[in-house]
Curated annotation (Swiss-Prot):
Residues 21-40 form a propeptide. The modification 4-hydroxyproline is found at residue 51. Belongs to the conotoxin Y superfamily. The cysteine framework is XVII (C-C-CC-C-CC-C). This is Conotoxin ca17a. Its main location: secreted. It comes from the Eukaryota. It comes from Conus caracteristicus (Characteristic cone). One of its GO terms (cellular component) is extracellular region. It is found in: Secreted. GO terms for molecular function: toxin activity. The keyword Kinase does not apply.
Length: 74
């Protein structure tokens, strides 16, 4: 049992630790993805049921079967 515990601890020590810079980069990447989606989808009025519309409508609103930035419409 002790050998298993020591082995587990050794494996955990070998795992790379995320750094603050990694987290910051991930946040920047996520923000850029949001901008890309908003740019590509904003006000396009794609059908909510089409493949492009499905991606857009996850972030936007489906109004009268069209993807729109707000519930007020496109």
């Amino acid at each position: 049992m002790q050998k298993a515990t020591v082995l587990l601890l050794a494996l955990l020590l070998l795992l790379p630790l995320s750094t603050a810079q990694d987290a910051e980069g991930s946040q920047e990447d996520a923000a850029q993805r949001e901008v890309d989606i908003a740019t590509r989808c904003g006000g396009t009025g794609d059908s909510c049921n089409e493949p492009a519309g499905e991606l857009c409508c996850r972030r936007l609103k489906c109004v009268n079967s069209r993807c729109c930035p707000t519930t007020d419409g496109c």
